[in-house]
Amino acid sequence: MRRSGILMHISSLPNDYGIGKLGKEAYAFVDFLEKAHQKCWQILPISPTSYGDSPYQSFSVHAGNPYFIDLEALEKEGYLKPAEYKDIEWGDDKGSVDYGKIYEVIFKVLRTAHKRFRKKPEKAYSKFVVENKDWIYDYALFMSLKFANKGKAWYEWDEPLKMYKPKAIKSARKEYANDIDFWCFVQYKYFQQWKKLKAYANEKGIEIIGDIPIYVAYDSVEVWSTPQYFSLDKEKKPVEVAGCPPDAFTADGQLWGNPLYNWEYIARDKFRWWVERIKAASNTYDVVRIDHFRGFESYYCIPYGAKNAKKGKWRKGPDMRLFKEVRKQLGDVKIIAEDLGFLTKHVVKMLNASGYPGMKVLEFGFDSDNTNGYLPHNFKTTNSICYTGTHDNETILGWIKSCDEKTRSYCKDYLGVTKDEFVPWAMVRLCWSSVCDTAIAQMQDILCLDDKARMNTPSTVGANWKWRLESFDKLDD
């Protein structure tokens, strides 16, 4: 069945509290999607953001972002008083997230709620913690220690804690018991609210498309507590890190800095770490997009400490062995393979063997001639997701205004429009009319916004992940 949807992260929802929440605005957005006959809401990773604010560099692959917790719901439950969160400065620009300001105040507010919660815990709380024991205890301890160490990365902690020594861990669990309970409470409330929102969306016939990065952050609870799954030395330093080689767009390549996986160990363990991760994601979302899918066939390794990605090398990944195990243990999980970037015949073979739909990004279609594989008349399968652009792209209006005259002219001729301002909606129509089973447009392209609304510019920090929809007024049109 053909369907379409909108790409907009939770952080971009409007409200008065600095960043999008799982509250009434999220439900209103679901109502908008239903009214607009959309069937999908695609979001970015929902994990807690760390330094740089990227949802793709998180302290945990399992935890939800505390920033998204609906404070009004906590008030209704009796855990907050209005003045305790409404009289706080959350940022002075409704169109942009001030992550620094939110970090300053959100945990004080949530700790206030936790104090009241502890006086009369909900019965479902203990059940939630037990059901998530495989990750939540270590995550709660990790966050407790991080705050106790004034935000320092785990590899800068005292040696016994850094090395996850059993005696030190046991002592820390006792010392930080109250803090651990707080971080468990935060996750309990997050997932309680998330499940209600997802159920509401599903009732309206809308699927949530989630996103998981292929790699995890070095400063994460997973690398700290389960180093055996990663390519680390005896001091828990990465041997090599992830990235991409130089190409026509980046002379130095891309140095992501994430530790790489110890695929030999993971394979011996029947890929349990990855199977559990995909299982958790499939329980959280209806469909799971896996970022940098080609990295499972072969991945680029850069020596730890290198200043750029020039001296890296390719190594073979687990390929279909992983996804055969996923299918064996989990059945047919709905997965989207982010297959953008440097693709070889081996990557294409893996994608075809998996049966997962890949991605077609229209913005990539106009930089050569009419044989470009991202132009709809060259699409060879319906088993793909067509996008106007992704979170890493310029908005369509920003792109058409910045590209060279030859590309601009070719694009307008292809779309049959005469002005730059007409291109975004023409591109949306092109996306919708492709043969792909699913078509997704960025909200910024639906609203014909320029690059001031761009979500992310890869390999840069500072101005990313900030864009917000100021209100739903424009959607009424």
What is the predicted function of each stretch?
Residues 448-451:
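Glycan-recognition and catalytic regions of carbohydrate-active enzymes
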Residues 24-49, 284-285, 431-433:
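Catalytic domains of carbohydrate-active enzymes, especially glycoside hydrolases
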Residues 1-11, 27:
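N-terminal regions that are enriched for targeting/export leaders
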Residues 34, 194-202, 327, 351-352:
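Surface-exposed amphipathic alpha-helices with a cationic face
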Residues 9, 15, 53-191, 216-440, ...:
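Alpha-amylase-like alpha-glycosidases and glucanotransferases acting on alpha-linked glucans and related
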Residues 183-216:
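Conserved, well-ordered alpha-helix/loop/beta-strand core segments that scaffold catalytic motifs
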Residues 44, 207-209, 213, 287, ...:
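Outer-envelope exported proteins of Gram-negative bacteria
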